[in-house]
Amino acid sequence: MSSKKPVVLVIRDGWGRNPLGPDVAKEYGDATVLADTPFTDYLLANYPHSLLGASGEDVGLPDGQMGNSEVGHLNLGAGRVVFQDLCRVDNAIKDGSMGENAVLKTAFSQAASSRLHLLGLVSDGGVHSHINHLIGIVKYAYEAGVRDICIHAITDGRDCSPTSGVGFIRQLEEAVRPYGAKIATVVGRFYAMDRDKRWDRNKLAWDAIVLGRGEQCSCSPAEYVEQCYAKGETDEFLKPGIFAYGNEQRVRDNDVVFFFNFRADRARQMSDAFLYPEFDGFDREVTPKVHYVTLTEYDAKYPSPIVFEQEQLNNIFGQIVSEAGKTQLRIAETEKYAHVTFFFNGGVETQFPGEDRILVPSPREVATYDLKPQMSAAEVADKFVDAVNKYDVVIMNFANGDMVGHTGFVEAGIAACEAVDSALEKCVKKVLELGGKLLITADHGNAEHMRNEDGSPNTAHTTNLVDLIYVADDKDQVTLSDGILADVAPTLLSLMGLKQPAEMSGHSLVTPGK
């Protein structure tokens, strides 16, 4: 069988372009500049490159809101600006339609005679949730007659500063006081929002939320968080603190549990424990029969009502490629596998005809990826090189820049970028050998800003632009324009000679001629 001449999209996750430049790279922890990346340097010196907007209104988020992996891959695959759940919920709270939502009305009606548990990430990170959504939900619940409202607050420290949690907890305490709601639990997202089946972490969160196990606190939730900081703990890793109904079954039969995160991937494992009687990830000890509600669709198979149903996207990139009879491959390690499949395919689990997938396991032997910043980049590259000649188009992701960027350890970030650079070289050389073409970009920034001005770690995403690099033998005959992530799918289609559908509002950024 003859080899294909593949078109390849390489997503260097979390690899943005810091506008402050190399002169302040050390001060701001720009791992992408501080790293020794000879191949990336070679590409930028010898191939057309431009910049893409990957945050705010460019990707369907509020102005100034940092981008994230879910949003980035949705826009990359859809070829249009996809308005995000963050904005949809914001608008529903502002215009009052949230209070008229039928799913919420039913949930609040049941909770009026039992207990309402609100579970989710408490920050303004806007990646998985937003504190304003929680405050709005509490208000609407109170107005619907719910009087026993327990908040199980998951602290962030990843999509915002590692010690910003105390401020959010204080803000929440003040905001919900008029409605009699109480913060019953505080626990870090490391435990409550694992997505890699490290069930021992979820067990700690479950025991706290359901059984009231953890540090029994007589102080306020904000004071507890401050005490954790004094012991060297940061928001992501806070052990459970219990502030109401301690050491008893707090989630009971007929209670309502509402997970208010709008992003699905890190909400599924705890949801599985609540929803499935046969769940065996860890010993739950008790399995309360609750009315479980999710803000958005976490899994199409879940037997639970959804407050905001998913908007369906038609004629996305994978669909167009499939309908043209072309073959496609999606490849990433575990941490970003959902992004090149579920999110790139419009937020649905559909695997198109002609679409194959390769999942490379992420390292399980380390708790955080600063301890192994290379992650599985080399293995992803090896699998890619072995498979690429069989496909018309490949979508691949290197997770390192984002996953290690979230740790805030600059030296680890440097090693992560170097690992990606080395793996990228192997992939690019193989594609060029086959006569193929590549677009190299990112879904959002992160690794280019790992240190704050005061020297503290910056673990959050950024609002920076991301590179777009065109790599092909005809590099001297094309011009590459600036754009946004939604322009990538139309560009890929043009490189494949496929017609762009009307639903795609993006534009091809590759034009013939210099």
From Swiss-Prot:
GO cellular component terms given for this protein: cytosol
UniProt keyword Transport present: no
Pathway stated in the Swiss-Prot or TrEMBL entry: Carbohydrate degradation; glycolysis; pyruvate from D-glyceraldehyde 3-phosphate: step 3/5
Listed EC numbers: 5.4.2.12
Residues annotated for Mn(2+) 2 binding in this entry: 13, 69, 443-444
Binding residues annotated for substrate, in chain numbering: 128, 158-159, 189, 195, 263-266, 336
Cofactor: record remark: Binds 2 manganese ions per subunit.
Highest taxon of the lineage: Bacteria
UniProt keyword Metal-binding present: yes
Pfam family, one: Metalloenzyme
CDD domains: iPGM
GO biological process: glucose catabolic process; glycolytic process
NCBIfam families per record: pgm_bpd_ind (TIGR01307)
Descriptive protein name: 2,3-bisphosphoglycerate-independent phosphoglycerate mutase
Species whose genome carries this gene: Akkermansia muciniphila (strain ATCC BAA-835 / DSM 22959 / JCM 33894 / BCRC 81048 / CCUG 64013 / CIP 107961 / Muc)
